[in-house]
Amino acid sequence: MAFTKIALKSTVAAAGIAAAGVLAPTAFADPEALQFGQTAEVPSPGGAIDYTVSNLQPSGHNDGIWYSDVTARAVSGFPTPNIADFNARAVNSSTYANMKGNQTDGLPNQPIAMGTQTSGRVYFDVRSGTAPDSVVYRDAGGTDKVVWTD
């Protein structure tokens, strides 16, 4: 009888530990760290996109506007580049959202067919902050997914 109680308690404890492991929240992974010019695959509405980010620099008009060149290549489906998920970040962690205008040389926010690509610039308003040194792709929940730096 004592053996049965011990076996039952052990079974319940093992089941509890297993359930805790299954139900535990997934740990957040560190974002993928890349050099400017390298490519990262990111899931997007309608498919997946390989993003290549390069040339983070001031616009040259002494107005505090910075930009980065971005190429988006559709890897699967018929995805739409999500320009709103790009941010510039400074070494002091200041983060600058992209400027959501319709710049003539901006990255198009339109679906792209699988195997094709589109390129353009993503602009950031850094007028009152520290100069950025990286471009960050964040998902809709605000989690950093990819960071491009020098």
Question: What annotation goes with each model-predicted range?
Answer:
Residues 2-54, 59-62, 116, 129-130, ...:
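Membrane engagement elements in two modes
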Residues 16-17, 107-110, 114, 120-121, ...:
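Histidine- and aromatic-rich ligand-binding microenvironments
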Residues 49, 82-84, 133:
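Short beta-strand/loop motifs in extracellular/secreted proteins, especially
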Residues 51, 68, 120-122:
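Hydrophobic residues positioned within well-ordered beta-strands of beta-sheet architectures
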Residues 62-65, 80-82:
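Short glycine/proline-enriched turns and hinge-like loops at secondary-structure junctions
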Residues 64-76:
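Short, well-ordered beta-strand segments enriched in hydrophobic/aromatic residues
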Residues 73-118, 147-149:
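The feature marks short-to-medium sequence segments in extracytoplasmic or secretory-pathway proteins
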Residues 121-146:
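Short, surface-exposed ligand- or partner-binding patches at beta-edge/loop junctions that are enriched
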